[in-house]
UniProtKB/Swiss-Prot annotation:
Its main location: cytoplasm. It comes from Bacillus licheniformis (strain ATCC 14580 / DSM 13 / JCM 2505 / CCUG 7422 / NBRC 12200 / NCIMB 9375 / NCTC 10341 / NRRL NRS-1264 / Gibson 46). Pfam families: DUF2129. GO terms for cellular component: cytoplasm. It is found in: Cytoplasm. Keywords: Cytoplasm. This is UPF0298 protein BLi01717/BL02989. Belongs to the UPF0298 family.
């Protein structure tokens, strides 16, 4: 059984409180220059965690990651070399 995970992007006013976000899930990345933190949590708990994180005064904004909703199976295109094969008519 695989647990579905959801990424949360938390924009902060100051990075001093970034450690405090560890209690909500796994802190995957902290950007010092852009002042945001990527936190992974269980998908069924995401709405409750977002509401709790937004209540803090040091949080500017909380965004959801769209990665779980993207189709990760890609179709291959034909090779351009095969498309312009000039020796086929000889």
């Amino acid at each position: 059984m695989e647990i579905r995970r959801q990424g949360l992007i938390v924009w902060l006013h100051s990075l001093k409180q970034a450690k405090m976000l560890r209690k909500f899930g796994n802190v995957h990345y902290v950007s010092k220059r852009l002042k945001y933190v990527v936190v992974y949590c269980n998908m069924e708990d995401a709405e409750r965690i977002i509401a709790k994180i937004r209540s803090y005064s040091f949080v500017k904004q909380v965004d959801l990651s769209y990665k779980p909703f993207l189709k990760m199976e890609f179709e291959s295109k034909q090779d351009k070399a095969k498309e312009y094969d000039y020796k086929a008519g000889l």
